[in-house]
């Protein structure tokens, strides 16, 4: 059996890891993107303006990682959204649909006790590299 190729994806246009993990890992055509918070990559600080601005920055960071892997948001097939307050769910949805416009990825959303650096939101994703064709059932 031939081995699959595993490659670390990294870009300076998204925040560096704040622990022992990679921004993303590509295995074959599947990209596993680590959770992104609303951290400005140049300052290393959370953006101000509450959960909406943090969500925008987290998704912008994710977009840069996707771009580094030769992808965009249309390649994303699954996301997990972690919220410090589940009452922010509707606000986050309004931001989320600015980045995911159709053929939405599968998703789970959870309220958690705390997030890194006091963030209000963290989003992780799985994407498939290369062209994708949407089939109708």
From Swiss-Prot:
Q: In which tissues is it expressed?
A: Expressed predominantly in liver and kidney. Lower levels in lung and brain.
Q: Name one GO molecular function term.
A: 2-iminobutanoate deaminase activity
Q: What's any one GO cellular component for it?
A: nucleus
Q: Which reaction does it catalyse?
A: 2-iminobutanoate + H2O = 2-oxobutanoate + NH4(+); 2-iminopropanoate + H2O = pyruvate + NH4(+)
Enzyme class, spelled out:
hydrolase
EC identifiers of the protein: 3.5.99.10
Question: One Pfam annotation, family name?
Answer: Ribonuc_L-PSP
Which GO terms of type biological process are on file? L-threonine catabolic process to glycine; lipid metabolic process; mRNA catabolic process; mRNA destabilization; negative regulation of translation
Protein location:
Cytoplasm; Nucleus; Peroxisome; Mitochondrion
Q: Point out residues bearing the modification N-acetylserine.
A: 2
Annotated SUPFAM superfamilies:
YjgF-like
- PTM annotation (Phosphothreonine): residues: 74
Instruction: State the source organism's domain of life.
Output: Eukaryota
State whether keyword Acetylation applies: yes
N6-succinyllysine PTM positions? 13, 60, 67
Q: Which UniProt keywords apply?
A: Acetylation, Cytoplasm, Hydrolase, Lipid metabolism, Mitochondrion, Nucleus, Peroxisome, Phosphoprotein, RNA-binding
* Modified residue annotations for Phosphoserine: 136
Q: Which family does it belong to?
A: Belongs to the RutC family.
What job does this protein perform? Catalyzes the hydrolytic deamination of enamine/imine intermediates that form during the course of normal metabolism. May facilitate the release of ammonia from these potentially toxic reactive metabolites, reducing their impact on cellular components. It may act on enamine/imine intermediates formed by several types of pyridoxal-5'-phosphate-dependent dehydratases including L-threonine dehydratase.
Quaternary structure annotation from Swiss-Prot or TrEMBL: Homotrimer. Interacts with YTHDF2.
What name does UniProt use for this protein?
A: 2-iminobutanoate/2-iminopropanoate deaminase
Look up and give the organism this protein is from: Homo sapiens (Human)
What is the name of the gene encoding this protein?
RIDA
């Amino acid at each position: 059996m031939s081995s699959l190729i595993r490659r670390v994806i990294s870009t300076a246009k998204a925040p560096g890891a704040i622990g022992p993990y990679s921004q993303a890992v590509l295995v074959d055509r599947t990209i596993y993107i680590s959770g992104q918070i609303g951290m400005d990559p140049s300052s290393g600080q959370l953006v101000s303006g509450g959960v909406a601005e943090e969500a925008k920055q987290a998704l912008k960071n994710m977009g840069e990682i996707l771009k580094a892997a030769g992808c965009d948001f249309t390649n994303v097939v699954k996301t997990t959204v972690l919220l410090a307050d589940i009452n922010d769910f509707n606000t986050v949805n309004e931001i989320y649909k600015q980045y995911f416009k159709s053929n939405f990825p599968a998703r789970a959303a959870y309220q958690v006790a705390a997030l890194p650096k006091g963030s209000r939101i963290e989003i992780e994703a799985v994407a498939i590299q290369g062209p994708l064709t949407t089939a109708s059932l």
